[in-house]
């Protein structure tokens, strides 16, 4: 599923993402935009450690989920990676919350550091009534 911008903003707000661990809704929206273009079915293979990033937040199989093919995978979210590709983003949101509960928080995502950190993010939630 490819979310419309405001549809995703409202959905993330409903899931309690706005202000979770001090991270504003606009930051989550910016992250999702640059990681997946709001697409729940996005995947990206990393040849370096043979891991894959999954879903709307591009959550990595080395640390967070199990895809059955990543060497030395940890599966800290205790889910199959396929769960991160569903139209229903409940499990993706729960796992993203787990990711940012670690000390580095949202800085775990390279795309956030590259495109969202220290930027004006108002456009990501503008006009969405959130």
UniProtKB/Swiss-Prot annotation:
Query: What intrachain disulfides are recorded?
Result: 6-128, 30-116, 65-81, 77-95
One GO BP on record is: defense response to Gram-positive bacterium
Where is it located? Answer: Secreted
Q: What is its EC number?
A: 3.2.1.17
Return the GO cellular component terms, semicolon-separated: extracellular region
Superkingdom of this entry's organism? Answer: Eukaryota
Protein keywords: Antimicrobial, Bacteriolytic enzyme, Disulfide bond, Glycosidase, Hydrolase, Secreted
Spell out the Gene3D superfamilies in the cross-references: 1.10.530.10
Among SUPFAM superfamilies, the record links this protein to: Lysozyme-like
User: Where do the catalytic residues lie?
Assistant: 35, 53
Where is the major localization of this protein?
secreted
Q: Which reactions appear under catalytic activity for this entry?
A: Hydrolysis of (1->4)-beta-linkages between N-acetylmuramic acid and N-acetyl-D-glucosamine residues in a peptidoglycan and between N-acetyl-D-glucosamine residues in chitodextrins
**Cross-referenced InterPro entries, in alphabetical order?**
Glyco_hydro_22 (IPR001916), Glyco_hydro_22_CS (IPR019799), Glyco_hydro_22_lys (IPR000974), Lysozyme-like_dom_sf (IPR023346)
Tell me the ranges covered by the C-type lysozyme domain, including all copies. 1-130
Which molecular-function annotations from GO does this UniProt entry contain?
A: lysozyme activity
Subunit structure of this entry?
Monomer.
- Similarity annotation: Belongs to the glycosyl hydrolase 22 family.
Report the function annotation for this chain.
Lysozymes have primarily a bacteriolytic function; those in tissues and body fluids are associated with the monocyte-macrophage system and enhance the activity of immunoagents.
Note from the entry: The sequence shown here is a non-stomach isozyme.
Q: What is this protein called?
A: Lysozyme C, kidney isozyme
């Amino acid at each position: 599923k490819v979310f419309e911008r405001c549809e995703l903003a409202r959905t993330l707000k409903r899931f309690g993402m706005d202000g979770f661990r001090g991270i504003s809704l606009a930051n989550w929206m910016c992250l999702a935009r640059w990681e997946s273009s709001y697409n729940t079915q996005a995947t990206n293979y990393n040849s370096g450690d043979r891991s894959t990033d999954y879903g709307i937040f591009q959550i990595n199989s080395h640390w967070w989920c199990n895809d059955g093919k990543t060497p030395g995978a940890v599966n800290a979210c205790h889910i199959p990676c396929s769960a991160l590709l569903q139209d229903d983003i409940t499990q993706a949101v729960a796992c993203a919350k787990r990711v940012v509960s670690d000390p580095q928080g949202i800085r775990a995502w390279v795309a956030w550091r590259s495109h969202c950190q220290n930027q004006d993010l108002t456009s990501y939630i503008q006009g969405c009534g959130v």
